């Protein structure tokens, strides 16, 4: 009996030692990677300290704000909002069929699933800014390049969110429709979409909000929107106009965030209330 207890204790000690070694090795690897990253990024806080007076001089030059070009700035803000809206709509139209093929419970076969997932990963794996550079070279300067950049990036983001909303759906109603002889299109239309629609709308609203924030800087590379105005003020050292542009961007993004957040809350809360008010089975 004592020998058995000693064996168990020895085994526990060995496991504890092995665990400590793994933790130590993991810590060494993580700290080494952080040290390499620190070196590569050339972190030098003394440069920040030396640059603070220059930064403060920029801040002083921002005031008072120059409102002489407010109409141009507001036009750029409207263009930015339009780019984000149209780009999100295009992305949603493309993403929905891809999401159906990228969800395990609705994809026709494993190859379709893998290809669709690869497309979505590639789409969202490339930043909107990179797409903007490509489309500016392809179709020229202007908001159309920004719309295309937002569309191509957001297809991957929306498609992934849609697929994740579709996969957990209860298969019971879908199987019941299939037993009645309903076509695949009707099963999706009457069995799947009503169940996931609130989550799909909430996802689109979130992406729209994100697209507005993203599109504010696309003008820096010539893809339209208020970013071009911001770049012009920086290039011309018009800091008092720059603060006006930044204020408009902040107000626009804050308003869109608030509207999107409220709409998502109302949509998802309505769905929860709908389930809560269902009559109980007797």
Swiss-Prot record:
Transmembrane regions listed in the UniProt entry:
23-43, 81-101, 130-150, 239-259
Q: Where is the ABC transmembrane type-1 domain?
A: 77-260
GO MF: ABC-type phosphonate transporter activity
Q: Record's SUPFAM superfamilies?
A: MetI-like
Name assigned to this protein: Putative phosphite transport system permease protein HtxC
Q: What does this protein do?
A: Probably forms part of a binding-protein-dependent hypophosphite transporter.
Q: Which PROSITE patterns match?
A: ABC_TM1 (PS50928)
Does the record bear Cell membrane in its keywords? yes
Which membrane topology term applies here? Multi-pass membrane protein
Keywords carried by this UniProt record: Cell inner membrane, Cell membrane, Membrane, Transmembrane, Transmembrane helix, Transport
Q: Which Pfam families match?
A: BPD_transp_1
Extract the Gene3D superfamilies matched here. MetI-like (1.10.3720.10)
What is the organism field in this record?
A: Stutzerimonas stutzeri (Pseudomonas stutzeri)
The family classification in the record reads: Belongs to the binding-protein-dependent transport system permease family.
Chief localization class? membrane
Q: List the GO cellular component terms.
A: plasma membrane
Q: Does the keyword Cell membrane apply?
A: yes
Q: Which InterPro entries match?
A: MetI-like, MetI-like_sf, PhnE/PtxC
């Amino acid at each position: 009996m004592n020998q058995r207890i000693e064996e168990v204790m020895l085994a526990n000690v060995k496991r504890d030692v092995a665990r400590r070694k793994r933790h130590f090795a993991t810590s060494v690897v993580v700290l080494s990677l952080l040290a390499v990253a620190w070196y590569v990024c050339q972190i030098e806080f003394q440069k920040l300290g030396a640059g603070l007076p220059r930064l403060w001089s920029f801040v002083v030059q921002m005031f008072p704000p120059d409102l002489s070009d407010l109409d141009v700035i507001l036009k750029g803000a409207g263009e930015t909002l339009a780019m984000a809206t149209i780009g999100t709509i295009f992305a949603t139209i493309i993403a929905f069929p891809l999401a159906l093929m990228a969800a395990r419970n609705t994809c026709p076969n494993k190859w379709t699933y893998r290809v669709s997932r690869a497309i979505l990963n590639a789409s969202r794996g490339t930043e909107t800014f990179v797409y903007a550079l490509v489309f500016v070279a392809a179709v020229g300067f202007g908001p159309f390049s920004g719309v295309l950049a937002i569309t191509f990036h957001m297809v991957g983001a929306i498609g992934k969110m849609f697929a994740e909303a579709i996969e957990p759906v209860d298969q019971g109603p879908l199987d019941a429709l299939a037993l009645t002889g309903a076509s695949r299109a009707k099963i999706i239309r009457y069995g799947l979409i009503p169940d996931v629609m609130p989550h799909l709308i909430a996802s689109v609203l979130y992406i729209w909000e994100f697209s507005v924030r993203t599109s504010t800087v696309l003008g820096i590379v010539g893809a339209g929107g208020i970013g071009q105005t911001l770049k012009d003020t920086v290039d011309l050292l018009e800091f008092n106009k720059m603060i006006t542009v930044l204020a408009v961007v902040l107000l626009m993004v804050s308003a869109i965030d608030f509207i999107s957040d409220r709409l998502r809350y109302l949509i998802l809360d309505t769905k929860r209330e709908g389930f809560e008010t269902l009559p109980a089975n007797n």
